[in-house]
From Swiss-Prot:
One of its GO terms (molecular function) is 2,3,4,5-tetrahydropyridine-2,6-dicarboxylate N-succinyltransferase activity. This is 2,3,4,5-tetrahydropyridine-2,6-dicarboxylate N-succinyltransferase. Substrate binds at residues 106, 143. One of its GO terms (cellular component) is cytoplasm. Pathway: Amino-acid biosynthesis; L-lysine biosynthesis via DAP pathway; LL-2,6-diaminopimelate from (S)-tetrahydrodipicolinate (succinylase route): step 1/3. It comes from the Bacteria. Its main location: cytoplasm. It is found in: Cytoplasm. The keyword Amino-acid biosynthesis applies. GO terms for biological process: diaminopimelate biosynthetic process; lysine biosynthetic process via diaminopimelate. It comes from Burkholderia mallei (strain ATCC 23344). The gene is dapD. The keyword Iron-sulfur does not apply.
Length: 275
């Protein structure tokens, strides 16, 4: 079924300039709606780990982008105090008490998740924003004013602290989503964008900014890398001096690596304070 769905969406994408809310076949509409519904249920996801490597399903990103072309903006009520005007309704717009109970997650006012995002059991959404295509796995806390961008992949038992920004990606199609693997802690006001991967059991301190151009300096090895935080890393904000010594530029510093057992036993503050 998903192969047939993918073929319809890939073909529609090639002719997307001709599509509009008034000009699209029933087959295309149904395929796009089904893809969004599957993303919403978590039956499909934009990226998944296969044989130890992350694979991105670009056709699902195409489905999300096509959905914008196929829908008109419409007023959306906001609990009587305001209205929104958009193409994508709230994930919870038509939820009943039974739906919330079956979902097994908490949604604290005024948290927003758009339809097409997946929220797993035992997730807590504090007043935060989760965009279309995102996947938030079991036991994760999305704290106050945190943002989970479009198509971002958040693992199990992750803590996204207050004000954290997890970047979204829909265009360009070749760009990969941000991935935060299981059991990671992302400190307050940190930003992870541009398809950076934070591997499992890592701790990112408060105020760390990670993009594809951010130098990641491993204090133990002296190595500089980009775009990926290795599993079990403890990362803080830092600076690296210029070659001529006239200035320094921002970087992220891996101050140590810990295994899952140590991570479970030792408090976060102790990990971050240790030499």
């Amino acid at each position: 079924m998903s192969q047939q769905l993918q073929q319809i969406i890939d073909n529609a994408w090639e002719n997307r300039a001709e599509l509009s809310p008034k000009a699209a076949s029933a087959e295309i509409r149904e395929a796009v709606a089904h893809a969004i519904e599957q993303l919403d249920r978590g039956a499909l996801r934009v990226a998944e780990k296969i044989d130890g490597a992350w694979t991105v399903h670009q056709w699902l990103k195409k489905a999300v982008l096509l959905s914008f072309r196929l829908e008109d903006n419409a007023p959306m009520p906001a609990g009587g105090y305001s209205q929104f005007y958009d193409k994508v309704p709230s994930k919870f717009a038509n939820y009943t008490a039974e739906d919330f109970a079956a979902g097994g997650f908490r949604v604290v006012p005024p948290a927003i998740a758009r339809r097409g995002s997946f929220i797993a059991k035992n997730v807590v959404l504090m007043p935060s924003y989760t965009n279309i295509g995102a996947y938030v796995d079991e036991g994760t806390m999305v704290d106050t004013w945190a943002t989970v961008g479009s198509c971002a992949q958040i693992g199990k038992n992750v803590h996204l602290s207050g004000g954290v920004g997890i970047g979204g990606v829909l265009e360009p199609l070749q760009a990969n989503p941000v991935i935060i693997e299981d059991n990671c802690f992302i400190g307050a006001r940190s930003e992870v964008v541009e398809g950076v991967i934070v591997e499992e059991n890592s701790v990112i301190s408060m105020g760390v900014y990670l993009g594809q151009s951010t130098k990641i300096y491993d204090r133990e090895t002296g190595e500089v890398t980009y775009g990926r935080i290795p599993a079990g890393s403890v990362v803080v904000a830092g600076n690296l001096p210029a070659k001529d010594g006239t200035h320094s530029l921002y970087c992220a510093v891996i101050v140590k690596k810990v295994d899952a057992k140590t991570r479970a036993k030792v408090g976060l503050n102790e990990l971050l304070r240790g030499d």
